[in-house]
């Protein structure tokens, strides 16, 4: 439980860092006079290394151990976040965002492999559901913390990053001192119970890499990652533009500062993602994972279409529903991936997967910016994202047939 909690807290933080730029992009854009296109590229500056770096981080985790990579990610992110206090021109900010993405990229291959290696298939979805809930809370906390800080100190996005740096450093110390995994490559190589049939049943040693199902899953997460990146980067802006919090302001009898209102609305929407992850983790069983993953992708389509024409408070409702169904895919996907990977290669497998999901997903923000600048609304961009989600929903379906794949939970029967 302690291991799951520590790793899940590191997961919450990585998504807080990932979503940090979207939470303050309007303030940064105002300071440096960025256009919407330039703001989209600012998101890409963080998301591209965040995705591509995951593959190389997976190689390092397989070589040096997951715990060392987690500690490096936390202390590196702390250093870069604190460096924003001395940020100068716009080119420096792009460089700092790139560096932050590099260190943040280290989390998923190390953290997910650690959890996959410490759990059995039948309990993995529930553990990853908890892991996903904290990740969603991390995403939601980014705009919430930004909104709170910008309410108290308007325009102070640097102080926001200083706070994130302090949180990163503190968690780095806790992981360094308290995280006690079974050991890299354990238990089938290092356990004193090596050779015990029960251990072999839990940790099969002859599970082979299966390229066909892995490729289908990775293509699906690349498409879903584009949807994720495109919606999240401009979510505070999308919700702010329509007065989505007007009913809440009327109920409270007070106005929310203009610099914070989009962030508070985005935080409310993204909290719904945590409930989606929890529900998916609770309902998932090894035999239902492909079907549920396909459904989670497919449910993005009507939500995104609703978001294209929703106005006022309905934008917030549409965004809440989208977040709920979109984030359901994460515990399902992360439970399926290790079933097609040998245990000693799960870090690099998750690394490549996240490279595709977040790396290809880095085109999402400039894609949305391109269409919105040209057509002055979200109709074309969100409709295009809905099309990508539909294609993603088709890809897990072949995994339902044992004629095409041999899954870990079949192997252990």
Language model feature labels by segment:
Residues 91-99, 314-321:
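Paired small-residue
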Residues 52-88:
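Conserved MFS/SLC helix-loop-helix module at the cytosolic interface between two early adjacent transmembrane helices
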Residues 288-333:
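C-terminal transmembrane helical hairpin of 12-TM major facilitator-type secondary transporters
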Residues 345-374:
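A late C-terminal transmembrane helix in Major Facilitator Superfamily
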Residues 21-22, 213-270:
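Extracytoplasmic gate region of multi-pass secondary transporters
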Residues 19, 47-55, 140, 270-278, ...:
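Residue-level signature of mid-helix packing/kink "hotspots" within the transmembrane helices
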Residues 96-135:
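Cytoplasmic helix-loop-helix junction between adjacent transmembrane helices
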Residues 131-183:
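Helix-loop-helix hairpin linking two adjacent transmembrane segments in secondary transporters
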